[in-house]
């Protein structure tokens, strides 16, 4: 039986949004308290990652990202570290993702190939056949490397924007009510800062991949799509 695929919106809600709201709004002494609030917020991505591991046989990237992000934010708040560390943390998350995207090129499972050049989107057997016929297998590898650096660049941009956004918004000492309110504002703004440029560049990379494949295979766009997408388009 095929495992259910991770739902990105549900993952985002459970692993990032709900924990962030708990940290910023319910970790004060009048509600949960600092330590209990931190532990409750952290429990959401942990439980969701365990659920993914049991049901889908994978931990889920967003759940892991949520855990790391909430854990680091909570540590900064609980131990009242200087707010500069929060700016570093907010920049570090997308920066590390971008580095991971590039490093994955040296592994058997490049992330861009897994995300964009896969059988869910494309008819890989037909594409491979045409690439071999046209002697363009090397060219498609070069195309995937270029698209990898495009996507990694989007995360670098997000890291820079996140750093300055955090420095601008969070100015109160950690452990104060003002810090928690500013953290809530940051949460509301920081993920669009990550998501919007990354999504835009992802679409550009996807367009570049599709355009390159049609050129290298000599097939029209409709022919390179997976059977599943062809059925949906009817």
Model regions and ranges:
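Short, Lys/Arg-rich, polar N-terminal cytosolic tail immediately upstream
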Residues: 1-7
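Lipid-exposed faces of alpha-helical membrane segments in multi-pass integral membrane proteins
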Residues: 10, 14, 18, 40-47, ...
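Structural signal for membrane-spanning alpha-helices in multi-pass inner-membrane proteins
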Residues: 19, 23, 52, 73-77, ...
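Structural signature of hydrophobic alpha-helical transmembrane segments
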Residues: 29-43, 62-63
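C-terminal ends of transmembrane helices
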Residues: 47-56
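Long, highly hydrophobic alpha-helical transmembrane signal-anchor segments
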Residues: 55-103, 174-182
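Membrane-proximal helix-loop-helix units in multi-pass membrane proteins
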Residues: 85-141
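C-terminal membrane-adjacent module
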Residues: 120-224
């Amino acid at each position: 039986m095929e495992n259910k695929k991770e739902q990105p919106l549900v993952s985002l809600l459970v692993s990032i949004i709900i924990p962030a709201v708990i940290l910023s709004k319910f970790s004060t002494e009048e509600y949960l308290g600092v330590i209990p609030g931190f532990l409750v917020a952290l429990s959401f991505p942990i439980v969701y990652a365990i659920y993914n591991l049991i049901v889908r046989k994978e931990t889920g990237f967003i759940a892991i990202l949520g855990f790391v992000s909430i854990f680091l934010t909570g540590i900064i708040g609980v131990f009242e570290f200087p707010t500069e560390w929060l700016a570093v943390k907010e920049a570090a998350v997308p920066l590390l993702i971008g580095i991971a995207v590039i490093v994955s090129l040296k592994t058997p499972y490049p992330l861009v190939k897994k995300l964009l050049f896969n059988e869910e989107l494309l008819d890989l057997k037909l594409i491979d056949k045409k690439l071999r016929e046209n002697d363009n297998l090397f060219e498609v590898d070069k195309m995937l490397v270029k698209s990898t650096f495009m996507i990694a660049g989007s995360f670098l941009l997000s890291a820079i924007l996140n750093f300055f956004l955090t420095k601008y918004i969070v100015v109160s000492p950690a452990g104060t009510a003002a810090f928690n309110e500013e953290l809530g504002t940051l949460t509301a703004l920081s993920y669009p800062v990550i998501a919007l440029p990354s999504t835009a560049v992802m679409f550009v990379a996807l367009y570049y991949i599709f355009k390159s494949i049609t050129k290298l295979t000599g097939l029209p766009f409709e022919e390179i799509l997976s059977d599943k997408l062809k059925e949906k388009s009817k």
